[in-house]
Every structure is written in C-alpha cells, then in structure tokens.
Amino acid sequence: MSARGKIIAILVAGMVAMAIAVPMAMSDDVGTSATVNNLAPDVAITTISPDPATPPCTVTVSGTLSDPNGIDDVSTLTYVVRKPNGSTYTSGSATVAASWSFNFNLDSYADAGTWTVEVTATDKGSLSDTDSKTFNVSEVIAFSIDFNKTNYGSIDPGNASTVSGDTTMETVGPAPPVKPTIKNEGNTVIDIQMSITDDASNPEPLFVGNTSATVGSVGPQTLTSAATTFDVNIAKGDTAKIDTTLSVPTGTSPGDYAGTLTITAVSG
C-alpha cells in the first residue's frame, strides 16, 4: 500500500472511532412536590362615620381586607354592632373586597353611650381574623305631644276647670276633645318642665299662679312663668298623661283670656 493510502485508511479509522464514542440522547421525569400553607386573612376597620352619631341616622363603617393566599381565598366578611350593654343591635354580611364598607341605621331610641362594631373575615380554610372599633352615640332629648291648645271653657269666679289627659297618643288637636299625652321620642329617660304665661291683652293676669298640672303621677304642682320640674322619669318610647286645672279666683274680671303653656324635656 502506498503512503497516501495508509494516511487515508488511518483517517477513516479515526473518524469511525469518534462516531462510536458519542453517547446516545436520553431523558427521564422527576416528580416535584410542595405544600402552600393556608394563612389567616387580615381585616381592619379604618373609619366609622359619623362619630359621634346623633340618632336617627345612618352609620357607615369602612375598612381594608387582605389575605396572604389572595383575596379570593376569603369566603365571608361579617359584622356585629353591639349596644353599650354588649347586646347585639344588628348584624349582617358585607361584600368581600380589599376596600369594603357597609351601612346600618340607628333608630330614634338607640341608646346613648359607647357602641362597638366587630368585623370578621373568614377564609375557605376556616381561618379568620376579627377587628373591632368603638363609636359614640349622642344623647337625644326629644318628645311629642298630641294637643295644640287647652280650652278650659267658661268658668265662674271661685270655680275651676280641669282638662284630663291619658297615655294614648292621638291625632294632634285641641284639648278637649283630645286628652293630653306626652311621649318620649328620644334615647334617654326624660323629666318634664312646664311654665305658663298670660297674654298681654288679658284683662288681668289669670293663668300664672292659678294653673296646676300633673304629669304622669307627679303633681299637682302650681305653674308660674318660671319652669316647674316634674320628676316623672319617662322612659324612651313611653308616654305619660298631662292633667291641667285652671282655678279662677273670686273677683276676676270678666272677659276672654289667653295664655301660653311651655313644655320642655330635660334629661331624667
């Protein structure tokens, strides 16, 4: 074999050896695993408005909500509103959202004092978080009466005329035929103050000092131009009767007389 032929044979043999040395391609699958822990949501009340609240009114509660597993992991957002004595006033559910709010109404008789709102977020794994915040309800003194005039009729000097009340609220009108009643429309116990004045056109003073009143079971007390207090303690939502009597002194000039009865409620 010539020298050239030997070189070619050697090159070919080398190439074959190189081809045999290259490994064939291979693959395999390896499983992986992990556990993502469920963590509790985080809820916070940011504002309660108005504070203080004056009933009757609507109260708005706002706040924030988050969850390490995502907001979609939160299943419910519930609330409880508690009175100053801790009893439940109202409860319900709010829409689950990163920024949430809900409203509730305070009625006229909502107790004055410190109220509490509790909000609870619960996720799909039953983990929960609760936040609470207080707000104040103002004292409201309010009342209504069912009479707009008291007519004692014609009275002889030396005699008296009484207009009696009852505890049933009627359509507002003159007494009689209406039987005077007062109702506590506020959110606290009230006492009553009453005063009376004579019109300047009267022939002489008549009502001042000659009119007496009984509120509920308190009285009779003589009414003057200064306020007289009836310690009657009318509870919120309750009523009391008002009886009044006009005594006409002997020697009183004949004629038509008019006056003004002023009724004021104060905290009892």
Positions of the model-derived regions?
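Aromatic sugar-binding surface patches on proteins
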Residues: 95-105, 111, 237-242
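Beta-strand-rich interaction surfaces with strong enrichment in secreted/lumenal proteins
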Residues: 91-93, 106-107, 228-234, 248
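Short, polar/proline-rich extracytoplasmic segments that appear immediately after membrane translocation
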Residues: 2-47, 126-160, 164, 187-188, ...
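Extracellular acidic, Ser/Thr/Pro-rich low-complexity tracts
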Residues: 63-71, 83, 123-125, 182-188
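Short flexible loop/turn segments that cap and initiate beta-strands
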Residues: 65, 69-90, 192-195, 256-260
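Short coil/turn motif common to extracellular beta-sandwich-like domains
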Residues: 54-60
